[in-house]
Amino acid sequence: MERIKELRDLMSQSRTREILTKTTVDHMAIIKKYTSGRQEKNPALRMKWMMAMKYPITADKRIMEMIPERNEQGQTLWSKTNDAGSDRVMVSPLAVTWWNRNGPTTSTVHYPKVYKTYFEKIERLKHGTFGPVRFRNQVKIRRRVDINPGHADLSSKEAQDVIMEVVFPNEVGARILTSESQLTITKEKKEELQDCKIAPLMVAYMLERELVRKTRFLPVAGGTSSVYIEVLHLTQGTCWEQMYTPGGEVRNDDVDQSLIIAARNIVRRAAVSADPLASLLEMCHSTQIGGIRMVDILRQNPTEEQAVDICKAAMGLRISSSFSFGGFTFKRTSGSSVKREEEVLTGNLQTLKIRVHEGYEEFTMVGRRATAILRKATRRLIQLIVSGRDEQSIAEAIIVAMVFSQEDCMIKAVRGDLNFVNRANQRLNPMHQLLRHFQKDAKVLFQNWGIEPIDNVMGMVGILPDMTPNTEMSLRGVRVSKMGVDEYSSTERVVVSIDRFLRVRDQRGNVLLSPEEVSETQGTEKLTITYSSSMMWEINGPESVLVNTYQWIIRNWETVKIQWSQDPTMLYNKMEFEPFQSLVPKAARGQYSGFVRTLFQQMRDVLGTFDTVQIIKLLPFAAAPPEQSRMQFSSLTVNVRGSGMRILVRGNSPVFNYNKATKRLTVLGKDAGALTEDPNEGTAGVESAVLRGFLILGKEDKRYGPALSINELSNLAKGEKANVLIGQGDVVLVMKRKRDSSILTDSQTATKRIRMAIN
């Protein structure tokens, strides 16, 4: 108070005022501070000071022809004196007002196109709903978030090339537009921005906003998708939050969300197949998300999630060096350790072989709902500081940290046997066994851990074995903090390797990720995910397997037909028939297979009994290992819609219905495609079955005599030509092959050439 009074007295004296307002600043340090460098040191002050002047703006001399010297009120708009040090004119802020009211108008058609991201933001805010403001402590943690809704995911180099091509098409310099998205965007933007009068630099800047993901490391409590981040300043303060529902979604958030769902589904499915890595790659390459190839999205999208990172590692892309355990991302912040195998005994006297980390280390742990700092030594937890949204989330983090510490009291807290298995029915590794065990029930773990008295530290409280907060006592080494732990900010990516069981390791051999770490959470994707791989047919249930299997046969009928007649075993072993087996009652699989294979063999042996529809219908049943039995079936059962449904061996049924008139097949009422050729008994089969060893040369040639019947063909000598009658009275010219090779390709070309010859 004294100081303020003193200052007031000083200010009341005119001399003080004069010194402060009139005296020049001549202290070198101060002058240096405010004049060195191009960076403005006090922009707000500079702006106020400039705008108080009469002519704070400079403009090109041409402005004198475009704007009158005075406005309607007689106020001067520009001064005849030149700006010191340049040949520009000094202009009043009033000139801007005059220009806005009376200046030339231009077409506004391009504005919404160029400033698309702004217009869309306004729409989202207009349709968004703001709820009540609540006052409460905010646990914010810094996360890397996307601050730019509505962007494509091009790299800055790719975007640069697109921008140059769109905005400065005539500039020199090599531009390589390779990716599909680059080409599509360039074409679209060139059309949109034809005759655009907006300054090219502005267009380039706005295009960059549309094409490139911009991320910042910001303190966030709550939603992290870009439509929430754009209103961060409205939804959360230091001690308050405001509920908000965005008024629209943007594609980039949808891509991120759908990518995570697709990756999780693919990793889960690959983990149970015979060769997980090969299956995973096959699925990533054949999946599309919102019409874009998943592998293209993986290359461009920086989303860090366990399943997504496993897919990236499989493709040979770099990923973050942090590792995952129990759904938390661990990042070592200091210390180091060496690994050693050690055998330990659980409370149930079961022996576990664990890889012990020897040495002092500190980690940050970041999960979706809780974060922590962990300090540990060899098999000992020294300190754990946790913060989380609620009791449950905090407990999850404590369990993971206790298991990770590998302490003896944790291993001794195991009751019962550890025999958890993964989706492929393989035993989990010991650390994940322990984790699963305590995630199911951690009572004994918390009870046996031990408690200790605590000091009163600001912002920290203790936590008891029943997970209630306490100010006097706490679980040994564990404290709960009001402050969150920031996510690891670095965007550094490292080279990793992946084994066939999808375990991802860094170059020192540390396991960063494994399928056990992939979340089981199911969600509904925002964008359509199209899994073309047969391995993913099961994801939508038995009906989808049935429809997809038949669709696949029809789509690939040309090749299937040839394999059916020449190399059936190879056909039966195709992975596309695997999912179908789960629909056939276990007891009947072998019998059905034996029956169908015998039936097919008869068709091959007896000319003219080839029946396309029947082969398509029964083919999936022949894929199971056959049992030799004399059993005959008039119908085969498949388990769909919760019960057994019958497929008739001869004739239509609700499951498999072929319409001769439209040549279309419906499976369970869903369209499964059209048969491209006439499935009349005898024709197609005879062509491919009989013309083996013959080359079709083209249409009938009268010089080679009358048309022979198919049976007379066998009398031809090698290299001899003849006309032959096939199918429904069509005649083609053939030559008997000189050597008995490439019989398979014969049938393929035969079918194609017969068509060409007939047409």
Curated annotation (Swiss-Prot):
Keyword Manganese attributed: no
Record's keyword annotation contains Chaperone: no
Domain of life: Viruses
A single BP term in Gene Ontology: viral RNA genome replication
Molecular function in Gene Ontology: RNA binding; RNA-directed RNA polymerase activity
HAMAP family xref list: INV_PB2
Family: Belongs to the influenza viruses PB2 family.
Protein name: Polymerase basic protein 2
Gene name as annotated: PB2
